[in-house]
Regions:
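A short beta-strand segment in extracellular, disulfide-stabilized domains
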Residues: 26-33, 115-122, 200-207
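Proline-centered linker/hinge motifs at extracellular inter-domain junctions
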Residues: 8-12, 50-53, 98-100, 105, ...
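C-terminal edge beta-strand
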Residues: 1-7, 86-95, 172-181
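Short beta-strand segments of immunoglobulin-like
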Residues: 16-21, 105-110, 190-195
């Protein structure tokens, strides 16, 4: 007579084997098993897996996919107790988030009365992906089509924030920005065009601007800054916004 012992099999059927990972994000999954009674020692082995994938002694798989490791990866995990052995076939799709490669400046200056017509551009490291543009928020009448065309006609001066999203169906990226509708400042002072020979020329500059908020900070008031674009060498604008020119070294005539 003899005794025949039937060794229990290792059941891995409860594991989900089609998974998704994202480039540059840690991917972790646990291997579950059923065995009655369970053997004291279980060994896990990766077969044909990516070089930088690891599995520890309790069946935890970890992987940090690189940008060069996009799309589908198929590999196997062997689970054995030295007698029974079961293979689990895995398929992981590595997704790279889409990239908005061309977009307006974070603060886009739009002259009053003009129309915003900007073509956003994108790319995705994955092959055969369909990207979707979406306008998450924005001013009234702003539109964003599926070709990345961002359009708006606005007349209200100041900041108009908006947010767009680009999605590949798995991951998405967002872009927050603002359109600043601007009207140019207007001089309210009248220039002095004649000065007696040898005397000091002074012209008090003043101007107004219908934009009351700074284009660069929506929490700061607007500021008018005067600068001299052209003039005689000794002409300058002082700290009190006075255009000053010492004329004693200049002969009579017209100066621009």
């Amino acid at each position: 007579t003899f005794t025949l012992t039937v060794h229990p099999e290792i059941d891995l059927s409860m594991n989900q084997t089609r998974l998704t990972a994202t480039v540059d994000k840690i991917f972790v999954t646990d291997i579950s098993l059923q065995q009655f009674p369970q053997s004291e020692e279980i060994v896990y082995n990766l077969i044909h897996a990516p070089e930088n994938m690891r599995i520890d002694t309790i069946g935890v798989v970890s992987w940090l996919p690189l940008p060069t490791q996009v799309d589908d990866y198929n590999f196997e995990i062997e689970v054995t107790d030295g007698i029974a052995s079961t293979l689990l076939q895995y398929s992981i799709y590595v997704n790279a988030p889409p990239v908005i490669s061309l977009r307006p400046p974070e603060i886009f200056i739009l002259p009053e009365g003009e129309k915003l017509d900007f073509s956003l551009e994108s790319f995705d490291l994955n092959s055969n992906t369909e990207l979707e543009w979406k306008l998450l928020s924005g001013p009234m009448e702003m539109t964003l089509n599926q070709q990345g065309g961002l359009n708006w006609s606005g007349s209200d001066l100041g900041h108009h924030p908006y947010e767009i999203q680009l999605s590949d169906g798995i991951d998405s990226v967002q872009w927050k920005a603002s359109i600043y509708v601007n009207t140019p400042p207007v001089f309210t002072s009248t220039p002095i065009t004649v000065v007696p020979e040898g005397e000091r020329y002074e012209y008090h500059l003043s101007a107004k601007d219908e934009n009351t908020i700074s284009p660069y900070d929506s929490l700061v008031g607007n500021e008018i800054i005067f600068s001299l674009a052209q003039g005689p060498d000794s002409m300058k604008i002082d700290e009190n916004n006075i255009l000053v020119w010492e004329t004693e070294d200049n002969p009579p005539g017209e100066y621009m």
